[in-house]
Curated annotation (Swiss-Prot):
It is found in: Cytoplasm. This is Uroporphyrinogen decarboxylase. It catalyses: uroporphyrinogen III + 4 H(+) = coproporphyrinogen III + 4 CO2. Gene3D superfamilies: 3.20.20.210. Catalyzes the decarboxylation of four acetate groups of uroporphyrinogen-III to yield coproporphyrinogen-III. GO terms for molecular function: uroporphyrinogen decarboxylase activity. The record marks D76 as: Transition state stabilizer. Substrate binds at R26, Q27, A28, G29, R30, F45, D76, Y153, S208, H323. Belongs to the uroporphyrinogen decarboxylase family. Keywords: Cytoplasm, Decarboxylase, Lyase, Porphyrin biosynthesis. PROSITE patterns: UROD_1, UROD_2. It comes from the Bacteria.
């Protein structure tokens, strides 16, 4: 690997760095005018995320504008589904719609094995272009959705407020759900390895909806499958740092730490000082800043960044938001977040 590593990768590996790296979840997207202009020309989300030229261009937009320390692939957690035989569409302002929601064993048994270099070659293309072009100026990030969250989408058929369909399956037909989760874990593990081979230097697992589970159900339906994904990746790439993000994770932080990930990405509903006490010291911490602060003034943004960093500076830390940046966020304020983040020092 050599010692001349980009900052975010160095920090994620636990090496000594002069400042915490900074990037943002959803840093490429709707808050940027350049993205909205491109979206008018290419209204289909799937085209924007599956056409390698467009995905590359969008991934680079925030890098060219703000020079964050991480450049994350522009894609979606549902992108691998068609390669398993599950079709979906993303409708602007409505979110994802699964064409044929999975509700029975026949459908699970019909799922195809994911072969990423066949069904997701466009992702490999984008990651290798990013790696080539950002050089050591930033770290290239890949990402996937975790098995529970993918299952929540494909069983519900769309975003849900109370997850009654997948919870019904969990408590009435747990064997069926475990088969589906197991299929996803193997596929997602392979997909992450493909991303790493293609150029991703750090990867993040999003289990966006695992915060909807009680801790005891997390131990049955989410944690073991997160761990399975991590184990598959670490077997071949033991040195690639893995970040785990769950929205609403305050009740399961200790459990997240047992999955084998290197870094836990916090939402903003947990005090970061308390999180530091609950997460073992060998595990890094990312995020925790409320994305809503970016609707405030510049001073409040700087103050919140300083306040968060001062509580966590004894730890391996990556500055980020506690959720994706929100549509409508002023671009000037995103710029302040990055600029001020780069002024922090250990």
């Amino acid at each position: 690997m050599g010692e001349n590593l980009p900052l975010l990768l160095s920090a994620a590996l636990g090496k000594k760095v002069n400042r915490p790296p900074v990037w943002m979840m959803r840093q490429a997207g709707r808050y940027m005018k350049i993205y909205r202009d491109l979206r008018e020309r290419y209204p289909s989300f799937r085209e924007r995320s599956e056409n390698p030229e467009l995905s590359y261009e969008i991934s680079m937009q925030p890098f060219l504008a703000f020079k964050p320390d991480g450049v994350i692939l522009f894609s979606d957690i549902l992108t691998p589904l068609p390669g398993m035989g599950i079709n979906f569409e993303i409708i602007e302002s409505k979110g994802p719609i699964i064409e044929d929601p999975i509700r029975n064993i026949r459908q699970v048994e019909k799922l195809k094995e994911l072969i990423p270099n066949e069904s997701l070659s466009f992702v490999g293309e984008v990651l290798s272009s990013l790696k080539k072009d950002v050089k050591n100026e930033a770290t290239v990030l890949g990402f996937v959705g975790a098995p529970w969250t993918l299952a929540a989408y494909v069983v519900e058929g769309k975003s849900s407020k109370n997850y009654s369909l997948i919870k019904s399956m969990a408590f009435k037909e747990p064997d069926l759900l475990h088969k589906l989760l197991d299929h996803f874990a193997k596929s997602i593990g392979e997909y992450l390895k493909y991303q790493i081979k293609s150029g991703a230097q750090v990867v993040q697992i999003f289990d966006s909806w695992a915060g909807q589970l009680s801790p005891q159900d997390y131990d049955i339906f989410a944690g073991p499958y997160q761990k399975k994904v991590v184990d598959i990746v670490k077997e071949e790439f033991p040195d690639t740092p893995i970040i785990l993000y769950i929205s609403g994770s305050a009740g399961v932080l200790e459990r997240m730490a047992k999955t084998g990930v290197d870094i836990i990405s916090l939402d903003w509903t947990v005090d970061i000082e308390e999180a530091c006490k609950r997460i073992p010291t060998g595990i890094g911490i990312q995020g925790n800043v409320d994305p809503g602060i970016l609707f405030g003034n510049k001073d409040s943004i700087k103050e919140r960044i300083d306040n968060t960093f001062n509580k966590v500076k004894e730890r391996k830390y990556i500055l980020n938001l506690g959720h994706g940046i929100l549509p409508g966020t002023p671009e000037e304020n995103a710029k302040t977040f990055f600029e001020h983040g780069k002024k922090l020092t250990y």
